Amino acid sequence: MSFQGKKSIPRITSDRLLIRGGRIVNDDQSFYADVHVEDGLIKQIGENLIVPGGIKTIDAHGLMVLPGGVDVHTRLQMPVLGMTPADDFCQGTKAALAGGTTMILDHVFPDTGVSLLAAYEQWRERADSAACCDYSLHVDITRWHESIKEELEALVKEKGVNSFLVFMAYKDRCQCSDSQMYEIFSIIRDLGALAQVHAENGDIVEEEQKRLLELGITGPEGHVLSHPEEVEAEAVYRAVTIAKQANCPLYVTKVMSKGAADAIAQAKRRGVVVFGEPITASLGTDGSHYWSKNWAKAAAFVTSPPVNPDPTTADHLTCLLSSGDLQVTGSAHCTFTTAQKAVGKDNFALIPEGTNGIEERMSMVWEKCVASGKMDENEFVAVTSTNAAKIFNFYPRKGRVAVGSDADLVIWNPKATKIISAKTHNLNVEYNIFEGVECRGAPAVVISQGRVALEDGKMFVTPGAGRFVPRKTFPDFVYKRIKARNRLAEIHGVPRGLYDGPVHEVMVPAKPGSGAPARASCPGKISVPPVRNLHQSGFSLSGSQADDHIARRTAQKIMAPPGGRSNITSLS
């Protein structure tokens, strides 16, 4: 089935390339070999390859050849108060390619009154005409309605979508109740898709926002104060509980705190099928900047859940990422200019949420995890590319350097260093939340769909060249365990005879507006237990008694001291 839709942008001829002398790095092995690329695919891998004449040769000696990065979380068209982000599909995907990412997964967020299917079509139209690299789509469920099952089924079967996100925050806008989550998770499980959650306790956040605003706290620091770490951790634990009961695989987006990450790690150790996604911001900086005297700088950090002010959080998250307790990395890239952020200059709750990270993600993970010795080059490939491709079911088309895979490749220089700055980034915003951070490791050449997109610091991109990548359901990486548990977890009642004894009659409380309380129906004869009447006791102080026939003395004198006799020589 084709999911390409109505896209009519002409395909651009791919380059014919020979990458020589590089060290190929996949998630499970590394080796030296040459790579022949043609028609947008990897044609050959090996030594002394026979290739056509006139082919472009790229010298990769001393460098690594990696599968292109996959950014699992972007919001390049997220509508906020009638505004759209500064980095749209064109600028955002250009920045992605500059950083070594060759595929993104963007979130469809339906406007009020717009169906999931209609919103999906809107996103496809925007991305097809502007994206510079390949992309796919998650769909956010922003409200519950009776026909949601039919919409989800259509998106899965007809549109190539296999992941849906629900919100536990943003009360009165898109927050789901626990019962709604359980029902949605059950539908998603039956469809073979993946349930995602934005995990925060929206009720507490709203109350904290009101309290802080009443105290006169209106600046960006109010945002982090109204989103304490505990509301994220509690929501993660609750989401894990609901997903486990529904036997639905769970994917937690934007893991920002130690508590949330630990809740995921502990759930995995209990056997829950759950995946956690730290983002560039939570791995590369901290939330101390919310208290900056520069309002615009502080506002640039506003996102939900917030960047944690604890400076040890990033180290904790990179440790869990290196150990496998967290599996993927995203950017949650959603940027707004200072003028757009200033909509909330007098009320932190109105500041558009979102940070940058799409361009910096690959280098930041290398700096924090590989250069620091926490993970090796293969694990780096896993958390920046391969695991995402496996979880969302487009592996090995993406996420692997192998014959037949898409020619989305990054020639990586582990010795390169760069200092992140708003003066040099490929974004349309004035502030970069990683300003001044020095990173070791950077892309030297980026190849997208078999075409060179970055070389010698120069970009070669074409808006609209990006293709939509459809995803099938029931990915093995996720659903093998779910299927096994479905077979093993069948529930059977205990075989027993029908109870036919007495049943006590009770009053069932009436529902509001239904009139008088109803009497519970009882199938058997009612047996009323006896009640003792104290006024009808058989005991009497007058008349004949049962022991009147026993002879009694009129009196008996007892010779004993007060308290009775005692014998100090005997303890018996």
Swiss-Prot record:
Q: Known InterPro entries for this protein?
A: Amidohydro-rel (IPR006680), Hydantoinase/dihydroPyrase (IPR011778), Metal-dep_hydrolase_composite (IPR011059), Metal_Hydrolase (IPR032466), Metallo-dep_Hydrolases_sf (IPR050378)
Predominant place of localization: cytoplasm
Which molecular function GO terms apply here? Answer: filamin binding; hydrolase activity, acting on carbon-nitrogen (but not peptide) bonds, in cyclic amides
- What Gene3D superfamilies does this protein's entry cite? Metal-dependent hydrolases, Urease, subunit C, domain 1
- Does the record bear Cytoplasm in its keywords? yes
Q: Which UniProt keywords apply?
A: Cytoplasm, Phosphoprotein
Instruction: Please give the GO cellular component terms listed in this UniProt entry.
Output: cytosol
List the protein's name. Answer: Dihydropyrimidinase-related protein 4
The gene behind this protein is DPYSL4
